[in-house]
Amino acid sequence: MAAIAIRGAEFSDLPYFYEICLKTGGAGNDASSLFYDPYIIGQYYAAPYLFFERDLCFVAEMDGVPQGYVAGASDTSAFNRWLESEWLPPLRRRYQNYAHEKIKTDVEKNSVALFYKKLDPAGEAERSFYKTYPAHLHIDLLPSLQGKGQGKALIKTLFAALVQKNVHGVHLGVSRTNAGAIAFYRKMGFASLKEEKWGLVMGAYI
């Protein structure tokens, strides 16, 4: 029987963050075939969290190999300021001449465009759901861990860590085509806060 455990993330987990993010990046499905550069999606949705607030990153591993993670930021506005000042500038320089012939799909094109989207922490802070739900999270599990209660365990672990920081509201974004994820988040206490073109913003008070 496989041994499954949840632990705090280490910097050495970074390759797994990239891999898991890519293999779940197609609304929960493997997005490997959608990218010429397999690291692009993880550069935005996974890796920065390990460097910004690693104590809010946790992995679920099977037989010692990470196969899922949850990554959070306790203050989304502060996280966005850090992205703008520290994380995104090198990526913007690196990908500014990213050859169009290398971009395989619109998914990859849109992912690269995220690096150049100007974040406005001051404006975001005015949104009512940021006041009530200042934290946010991303969670991804490979199929090998799905249906084993590890998604629930990861989110509960993150919730406990947020409460330790006196943070009681958290939000996330989910594609409207990912019905399974939406149902899971509702079971975890998340409710829809607003609709975007790409999907739903959901929040939970913990």
Annotated model-derived regions:
Residues S77, E124, H171-G173, R186-A204:
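Conserved catalytic-core motifs of GNAT/GCN5-like acyltransferases
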Residues S77-H138:
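Conserved acyl-donor/pantetheine-binding loop and adjacent beta-alpha core of acyl/acetyltransferases
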Residues M1-S12:
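Conserved N-terminal entry element of GNAT/NAT acetyltransferase domains
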Residues H138-L141, G147-A161, A183-K187:
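Conserved acetyl-CoA-binding loop-helix of GNAT-fold acetyltransferases
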Residues F35-C57:
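Active-site rim helix/loop that mediates acceptor-substrate recognition in acyltransferases
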Residues V59, V65-S74:
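Conserved beta-strand in the GNAT
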Residues Y133-A135, L162-V174:
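Conserved GNAT acetyl-CoA-binding A-motif
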Residues E19-Y36, P48-Y49:
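Helix-loop element at the rim of GNAT/NAT acetyltransferase active sites that forms part
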